[in-house]
Curated annotation (Swiss-Prot):
<keyword id="KW-0843">Virulence</keyword>
<feature type="glycosylation site" description="N-linked (GlcNAc...) asparagine">
    <location>
        <position position="440"/>
    </location>
</feature>
<feature type="glycosylation site" description="N-linked (GlcNAc...) asparagine">
    <location>
        <position position="288"/>
    </location>
</feature>
<comment type="function">
    <text>Promotes invasion of host epithelial cells by adhering to receptors on the host cell surface to facilitate endocytosis of the pathogen into host cells. Probably binds integrin ITGA3:ITGB1 via ITGB1, on the cell surface of host alveolar epithelial cells.</text>
</comment>
<keyword id="KW-0325">Glycoprotein</keyword>
<feature type="propeptide" description="Removed in mature form">
    <location>
        <begin position="568"/>
        <end position="596"/>
    </location>
</feature>
<dbReference type="GO" id="GO:0098552">
    <property type="term" value="C:side of membrane"/>
</dbReference>
<keyword id="KW-0336">GPI-anchor</keyword>
<feature type="glycosylation site" description="N-linked (GlcNAc...) asparagine">
    <location>
        <position position="82"/>
    </location>
</feature>
<dbReference type="Pfam" id="PF08757">
    <property type="entry name" value="CotH"/>
</dbReference>
<dbReference type="GO" id="GO:0046789">
    <property type="term" value="F:host cell surface receptor binding"/>
</dbReference>
<feature type="glycosylation site" description="N-linked (GlcNAc...) asparagine">
    <location>
        <position position="544"/>
    </location>
</feature>
<comment type="subunit">
    <text>Interacts with host integrin beta-1 ITGB1 on the cell surface of host alveolar epithelial cells.</text>
</comment>
<feature type="glycosylation site" description="N-linked (GlcNAc...) asparagine">
    <location>
        <position position="163"/>
    </location>
</feature>
<keyword id="KW-0472">Membrane</keyword>
<dbReference type="GO" id="GO:0044409">
    <property type="term" value="P:symbiont entry into host"/>
</dbReference>
<feature type="signal peptide">
    <location>
        <begin position="1"/>
        <end position="17"/>
    </location>
</feature>
């Protein structure tokens, strides 16, 4: 019977073992990359010597464990196989694809934007793509150390959760290099060769996020805005490398003043033969008919100059905003419903470097194929959620009804709010947004879960010494966590403007809006003990320990306990799978004996 059992077990193992494809990114590898399965090492190979992306096959049962070994050093954790191929994994990152980050709800569905491409895996927030730029060493060094305005040809490789795409002869360079107050961690841009696209886009921009210790605000803003049914730019955090040198974590996004964004978000990759006029709004871009339109800078490919915006501005200025019919008629030449949604977001986040407060960092698109209809474009969401906010602390309590007086330059929104019907729509959007998404109960769980998922990459980013000239705040890894709940001061020469914690701002703004609009507080919480999300990495559970004060200290304690609990649970995962296997085998033996 013992020999029979042994034979049965061997048969079952043979039947259920499968050839598995392993895929791992290992930028630090110098000599070898291997996968370790029960002590058996299998060599993995890179198909392109420029890209540290290694693949290979080995036999393994579904649910069994494995780990990667680079230059003889093994990962300190076990991975569990799920399927016959791994996703594109990253050496020493325990979580490849997040499964515990809550999904933000879609709101304001009536009239929501449906024309754009937002489904490509490159924008999947549960995965951190890796971007590799390969160019001539002297040219790449020129960009990094001299921050030149030159652009160079380079090979760009995008690695998403499942696929890898490499495109040759891309044009690569810095975004607005050499400015006096630039940060040492630069912002980069590249264009793909004509006729080539990734995620239906041909132009990419990655922003350094250096003003924000958490590195979450800018993407969070865009994510919420799209959940509100707008055509806000797509965004995702990426790891970025130049000639295999790690440059850090960046926010990869659509640049809304480029036709790549218009093609993707307005036409789903199938633009009309004649595209419309596209503008970048600099300081003073208010759409003021009594002035000029010179603050709107046309894209170099725009078929119309800035004066083409004047007919819209004059038509808007001529509206009697006490007349509902005239206001409704605006929608024939301006999508003001989308504009109202963007203004709700500006108000909630104190987006001081945007349209309502400063009449800057906006833009416009004139759709010549749709009766020259004007679309407002929102961009650059880094100065939000209290970052660099030059206002008194109680500014967070300012109701939106005070904004037209406080910020008279925002002509479009201020005039629209003069109409009772439009004002009611704005207020409805504001109420719905606060009740369903912009509240501490929803964003607290979402933001902390995202931080925990990204923690190993944030720690890596904070360890990198930037080689470009510029401001260095010196935000620490610990501050990427602390600034979720409280203000922090940078240890570098520049102290930074992170006087508000991200969730601290959310909670304060939620409370203020609920009070001013007399909304119930059934879904509201404080930035304290109820904010907890399970940690997804050792760094999230062990390194996120700080001397937080008041409510933040409670949050820290709760989060770290959750992290510890999750860490223990993850360590017991192999035991769980082992028990499942034993149960499965015992049932299989029972069935086999019927036929022996």
């Amino acid at each position: 019977m013992k020999s029979l059992s042994f034979i049965s077990l061997a048969c079952l193992t043979a039947v259920h073992a499968a050839s598995v494809t392993f895929k791992v990114i290992a930028p630090t590898a110098e000599s070898s990359v291997q996968v370790n399965i029960n002590g058996q090492l299998t060599q993995l190979k890179a198909q392109d010597e420029d890209i540290p992306y290694y693949t290979g096959s080995a036999e393994l049962n579904d649910g069994q464990s494995y780990k990667y070994v680079v230059d003889g050093a093994a990962e300190t954790f076990e991975r569990i196989l799920n399927g016959t191929s791994t996703k594109n994994e990253f050496f020493n990152r325990p979580i490849t694809y997040a499964t515990n980050i809550p999904e933000l709800p879609n709101i304001l569905s009536e009239g929501s934007w449906t024309r754009g491409e937002t489904t490509d895996p490159l924008w999947d927030s549960n995965y951190v793509p890796s971007i590799f730029v390969t160019g001539k060493s002297d040219e790449m060094e020129d960009l990094i150390t001299n921050v030149t305005k030159k652009t160079y040809q380079a090979k760009i490789t995008f690695i998403g959760p499942e696929n890898i795409t490499t495109i040759e002869n891309c044009t690569f360079g810095l975004h607005k290099p050499g400015r006096k107050h630039n940060d040492a961690k630069q912002t980069w841009v590249w264009t793909l060769p004509e006729g080539q696209y990734v995620a239906k886009r041909s132009w990419f921009k990655i922003r350094h996020m250096e003003e924000d210790p958490t590195q979450l605000r800018e993407k969070l803003y865009a994510d919420i805005a799209r959940k509100m049914g707008t055509y806000a730019n797509e965004a995702n955090m990426v790891r970025f490398f130049i000639n295999k040198e790690g440059m850090g974590t960046f926010n990869m996004l659509d640049d809304v003043i480029m036709y790549s964004y218009i093609n993707a978000m307005f036409y789903n990759g199938n633009p009309p033969q004649q595209l419309g006029a596209l503008y970048d709004g600099a300081s003073g871009a208010a759409f003021n008919a009594s002035g000029d339109m010179d603050s709107f800078i046309p894209n170099v490919e725009s078929p119309l100059d800035q004066d083409a915006l004047m007919p819209f501005s004059k038509a808007f200025a001529a509206v009697d905003f006490s007349n509902d019919d005239q206001v409704k008629a605006i929608s024939q030449y301006f999508d003001y419903d989308q504009f109202l949604r963007f203004m709700v977001m500006e108000f909630l986040t104190a987006d001081w470097d945007g349209y309502w407060q400063e009449q800057t960092n906006d833009g416009a698109y004139i759709d010549v194929s749709d009766n020259n209809k004007v679309y407002y474009l929102a961009q650059d969401f880094d100065a939000t959620f209290g970052v660099n906010l030059d206002q008194e602390r109680d500014f967070v309590n300012t109701p939106y009804t005070d904004f037209p007086t406080k910020f008279p330059g925002g002509i479009l929104i201020n005039k629209l709010l003069e109409n009772p019907t439009t004002k009611a729509t704005f207020e409805t959007y504001l109420k719905t947004t606060v009740q369903e998404i912009f509240n501490n109960a929803t964003l607290g769980a979402y933001v902390t879960a995202r931080h925990n998922f990204l923690a190993p990459d944030l720690k890596w980013d904070r360890s990198i010494k930037q080689r470009s000239p510029g401001n260095i705040f010196g935000w620490t890894y610990e501050q990427t966590y602390q600034n979720l709940f409280e203000g922090v001061t940078a240890p570098g020469k520049e102290q930074g403007g992170a006087e508000w914690g991200l969730l601290e701002w959310v909670a304060a703004k939620e409370k203020a809006v609920r009070s001013s609009l007399k909304l119930s507080e059934t879904a509201t919480t404080s930035t304290s003990a109820t904010i907890a999300a399970p940690a997804t990495s050792e760094s999230a559970s062990q390194d996120n320990t700080s001397d937080d004060t008041d409510s933040a200290s409670t949050s820290s304690s709760t989060l770290n306990q959750a992290a510890a609990d999750t860490s223990s649970a993850s360590k017991s995962a192999p035991t769980f799978y082992c028990l499942q296997l034993v149960l499965y085998l015992s049932l299989s033996f029972k069935n086999l004996y019927k036929y022996i």
